[in-house]
């Protein structure tokens, strides 16, 4: 995954792609937390970046749910 995905890039993705991105990010966060607990994590900042990315995905999904934003290329989800 790219470091620091912008909300604009996320808004261009379909709902299915966003859900897949969310699943991947949560899996990565789980692995990072496991590495932190075992003392193997070398980049602590990555935890924060992944958490922020998860929050951005949830925000875009919620915007679409409330009708504040449409899907990619103006499609309604």
UniProtKB/Swiss-Prot annotation:
One of its GO terms (cellular component) is cytosolic large ribosomal subunit. Keywords: Ribonucleoprotein, Ribosomal protein. One of its GO terms (molecular function) is structural constituent of ribosome. GO terms for biological process: translation. CDD domains: Ribosomal_L29_HIP. It holds the Pfam family Ribosomal_L29. Belongs to the universal ribosomal protein uL29 family. This is Large ribosomal subunit protein uL29. The gene is rpmC.
């Amino acid at each position: 995954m790219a470091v620091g995905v912008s909300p604009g890039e996320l808004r261009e993705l379909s709902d299915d792609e966003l859900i897949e991105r969310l699943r991947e990010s949560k899996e990565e966060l789980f692995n990072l937390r496991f590495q932190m607990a075992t003392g193997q994590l070398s980049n602590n900042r990555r935890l924060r970046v992944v958490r922020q990315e998860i929050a951005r995905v949830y925000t875009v999904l919620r915007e679409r749910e409330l009708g504040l934003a449409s899907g990619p290329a103006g499609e309604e989800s």
